[in-house]
Amino acid sequence: AIEKYMPKNAKAADIGMGSGILGICAKKFGASYVYGCDNDETVIEVAKENALKNNVECLFELNTADKINEKFDFVLANILHNVLADIMGDLKNLMNDGGYMVLSGILDEKKPVVLDAVKKYSLELIEEVRQEQWVALIVRKVD
């Protein structure tokens, strides 16, 4: 999904970054800038080390989506379905008009919870990507 939907030289965000792998991939696929945050202090250093090991520059810090004052062309969020639904408004606020977001880490049976939030915030569903019992949703912010 990163390779397919992220514009070249995109400004990208990885929300709930964990190990930082999605942000690191975005950087390797040509993002000009990658910001990643997580609310778990223990993962920040791990993510920074992973970026270093992969020779990419990413800004990783302790933060939450509601406190970020930047806009991004491409947003990645691999978080539990209920958290995705709860913070969908904050995630939308991070997106530039026409920007894409990949919502992943969703169990198939929990997909309706996330889709309801996508509809509630008027995001356009572009594609569903399935892998076994997991689903990723690609959405776009329409002006």
Q: Model-derived features: where do they sit?
A:
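Conserved SAM/SAH cofactor-binding pocket of Class I
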Residues: 1-68
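Conserved helix-to-beta-strand junction in the class I
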Residues: 5, 93-95, 104, 121
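Hydrophobic beta-strand segment of the Class I
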Residues: 12, 75-77
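Conserved short alpha-helix immediately C-terminal to the canonical SAM/SAH-binding motif I
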Residues: 42-46, 83, 110
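Short strand-turn motif at the edge of the Rossmann-like AdoMet-binding core
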Residues: 79, 103-108
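A short glycine-rich, Lys/Arg-flanked "PGG" loop and its adjoining helix->strand segment in the class I
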Residues: 85-100
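Short alpha-helix
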Residues: 106-121
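Core SAM-dependent methyltransferase catalytic element
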Residues: 124-143
